[in-house]
A protein has these predicted regions:
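Short strand->helix junction
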Residues: 93, 135-140, 174, 180, ...
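Internal gly/pro-rich beta-alpha loop/helix module
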Residues: 127-128, 133-229
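N-terminal small/polar loop signature for handling phosphorylated ligands or for N-terminal nucleophile
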Residues: 73-156, 296-309, 315-316
């Protein structure tokens, strides 16, 4: 599913009327109907008074721009259907948008109940409140008067226990970055138009938007955007398109030969987790190369399906490998940095770089903060070290070191920086965070939509590295392996989360990978 930014939404509003001859007024009418359909999808609107006052109604809290006008259209359609609805207005009606002026007159002609917010006091009869104070164009800070109104709505919600909906995005949420202004409320639902807005998938925005319901725009906006939309959700639909059913004649040679390089005296478990995950994701053969000093103890702990060798056997280390994954628990000595450099030069096959292998790279690029702040993306990132085509799987701290930028800056420009890094270096970047994202060399970014808080424990990233390597060994492209790996890894954790909120281990996630693969293949068949 596509993901839209603020700029994408503006582009649609501007270009759909130009290119397709579908006016903004028609798009607004469709949006209003979409709100109504979303409400019907969650409630029996003819039974609003069940457990409530006999005079219960749906309240639309509308600003005087086009976001509020969407709410006016929805209120009008509900009234036409016989569902009680009332409208309260926020802002100066004398400064309203042209389409708002059209819609408010239509509501008046239908006899809709319309009050200014300060005059409204019938909160005890509100069954559902729908907020349309401002839309996707918001950025920065909320005005004090808006904060006061939102605080008042929240107080009334606590007192009278009604659900709160947002139109397109909650007031105070930046639709692109996911950052929320002071005073932003937490909503039960957000009905958003055409496609989900990026800010609803990025924290803290994801925490305030509630359940997102995507309402169709009633226009083929995708053909207008064309290649402009490069941000896509990672979900079951996408994973089902990627995964392939195995031929009955498949054998271990067909399913690939994976090499995991990692481990040190202090980090024995990390490479074991990666190697076992490669096995559980379906790799035909998995070899784990560790320093000779820990080889014996690793052999005693790893599952028997994993072959163990020494990193000192350089000559045969890369023979017949479909993929080499390097980094889990590897260590940060000068010798390790030399080893990583040697492998980058000597090995020409598929590579997955994680953890200490990323540390060994040092700074590979730098960010111009002023350009980034000003939105001059083309000038924001400069390459300092060339990299081979590979999959890189840093968490935020590791990514911070790679691009020499504080984490707070990365969080603020999460998707932009990932996209520019992958484009500049021509690599596949799996940036592990909340949410994890996969950025491709062509500028496409995939945003993970699943996973849970139980994944916040040491070793989860090692498992992901093994999963991605395992899929590469089976013949999936690096791109598909990264996307599929992120999905399968998170979905495995979600299955465990059904019985354990947290406390499950990375090893549990690894051993549950087959359940997810079966789930996907069941749909595939």
């Amino acid at each position: 599913m596509n993901i839209l930014t603020t700029e994408d939404a503006r582009f649609i509003d501007r270009e759909v009327p130009k290119q397709l001859g579908i006016s903004l007024e028609i798009l607004m009418e469709n949006a209003g109907r979409g709100i109504v359909d979303a409400l019907w999808g969650e409630y029996d609107l003819f039974s609003l008074n069940n457990g409530r006052s006999i005079n219960s109604f749906v309240l639309f809290i509308c600003g005087t721009g086009n976001n509020g006008a969407d709410g006016l259209v929805a209120a009008r359609h509900l009234m036409e259907q016989g569902v009680p609805a009332q409208i309260v207005l926020v802002g100066d009606i004398n400064k309203c948008s042209d389409l708002f002026a059209v819609q408010i007159e239509r509501c008046k002609a239908m006899g809709c109940s319309i009050d200014m917010y300060d005059e409204f006091n019938d909160w005890s009869n509100v069954a559902i409140a729908v907020e349309g104070i401002m839309g996707t164009g918001f950025t920065g800070r909320l005005r004090e008067v808006t904060i006061d109104i939102l605080n008042d709505i929240d107080t009334m919600r606590s007192q009278y226990n009604f659900d709160l909906w947002a139109i397109d995005v909650p007031a105070g949420l930046d639709a692109t970055t996911g950052h929320v202004a002071e005073g932003t409320l937490t909503y039960d639902y957000t009905v958003t138009f055409g496609a989900i807005k990026q800010g609803l998938l990025l924290y803290p925005g994801k925490a305030v938007g509630g359940t997102a319901v995507v309402a169709p725009l009633g226009a083929p906006w995708q053909q207008v955007l064309g290649e402009r939309v490069r941000t896509i959700t990672i979900d079951s639909d996408l994973a089902e398109k990627i995964i392939n059913y195995r031929t009955p004649m498949a054998h271990k040679g067909v399913n690939g030969n994976t090499l995991i390089i990692g481990g040190s005296n202090d980090m024995i478990g990390a490479p074991i987790l990666a190697a076992e995950a490669a096995v559980h994701s379906g790799a035909g053969k998995v070899t784990l190369a560790v320093p000779k000093i820990i080889k014996q103890i690793v052999q005693s702990r790893v599952i028997p399906e994993v072959m163990v060798t020494s990193t000192e056997t350089n000559k045969e280390l890369f023979d017949c490998r479909q993929v080499v994954a390097m980094g889990p628990g590897l260590g940060r000595t000068r010798e390790i940095c030399d080893l990583v450099d040697h492998i980058l030069e000597a090995y020409e096959g598929a590579l997955v770089l994680d953890a200490d292998a990323l540390y060994a790279l040092g700074h590979v690029g730098c960010v111009n903060k002023d350009a980034l702040r000003d939105g001059d993306i083309e000038s924001a990132y400069t390459v300092e070290r060339e990299l081979p085509y590979c999959v890189m799987t840093p968490h935020l701290g590791e990514f911070s070191r790679l691009i020499d930028l504080p984490i707070k800056w990365i969080e603020r420009h999460y998707i932009t920086l990932a996209r520019e890094f992958a484009k500049a270096h021509q690599v596949i970047l799996v940036l592990k965070g909340i949410p994890s994202i996969v950025a491709l060399p062509d500028g496409t970014v995939y945003v993970n939509t699943i996973g849970n808080a139980g994944m916040g424990t040491g070793g989860m990233g090692d498992v992901l590295t093994g999963v991605i390597a395992g899929f590469i060994s089976q013949g999936y492209s690096l791109q598909d392996s990264a996307v599929l790996g992120v999905y399968v890894h998170s979905r495995s954790a979600d299955i465990l989360n059904e019985t354990k909120s947290w406390g499950y281990t990375p090893s549990d996630v690894s051993t549950s990978l087959g359940c997810v693969i079966s789930e996907l293949l069941g749909d595939y068949e």
